[in-house]
Each structure stands twice: as C-alpha cells, then as structure tokens.
Amino acid sequence: MPLKGQIIRLDAPAPPLKVSLWWDDNYATTKSDGLLWAGTTEEDVGFDDGITDAARDLIITSAVEMLPYLEEAELVQQTACLRPITPDRAPIIDAGVGPDGLTIVTGAGRQGIMLGPAMGIAAAALATGTEPPVDVSAFSLARFS
C-alpha cells in the first residue's frame, strides 16, 4: 500500500531559508519557486490522495514552532501524494525476478528522493550484471516470500 504525504507551500514574509531544515518528521525548505515548502505527514490511508485540514494545521503548527515568523506566512497551496512503501518500510532493489533485464527499484516511501541516487547506482549495476558498490541483498524482493 502507499503512504500518503501532505505538504504545504507558504509565501513567507522573511527572506527565504538558505538551507533546508529537518526536525522530528518535518522539514522546511525554500524551493526555486520562491515559496517555503513545509511538511510532511505520513498517513496509512490506502489510495486516498485528498488533502485535509487536520494535516494542514499539523504542518503549520510544527513549522511555526520551529520558525515563528511563519505565523505571518500566507498559505499558497497544499498538496498530497502517494508514496510507494513496503511492509517493512525498506526499499526493494532487485534484479532477475521477472523477464530478463527487469530490475525492480521501489518502496522507499518519503526517503525515495534522498535514496534515489544510491538506489539508481545499485540498480544500474544489477541491470548490467555487475556487482553493486554495496551489498543490497537485504533489499531483495525474496524477503517477502
């Protein structure tokens, strides 16, 4: 099942953040659109990709606690997305489990954006029949058999 994550985009009254901030399960960062993006939720709600007032309020409260000046920010947009996640919350990185040449790389959830480059390097090695730079056997699809 997927894991839903909601984020908000704010027009902040102060200069943009020059670095991304992470605290607890939350983050805030200024994106190239000039807006401050803050989030996120982790909701096990099946394929429901709708936004909720409760998530908005939770994200805003957390962001304002970390960055009090955001109390004056304007909410520009709230979005939700569905992230692929495995039952054990570890990604799948595997080859040779289907048609020749098929390599499976999925299930990293909200960490996918950070793990993607490393997962891609491992997947490329598996797809070309070479040894990945690190042992990825723990991420085999067979662990769910």
Predicted regions and their residues:
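Active-site substrate-recognition segment that forms the wall
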Residues: 1-101
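C-terminal catalytic lobe of FAD-dependent flavoproteins
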Residues: 69-145
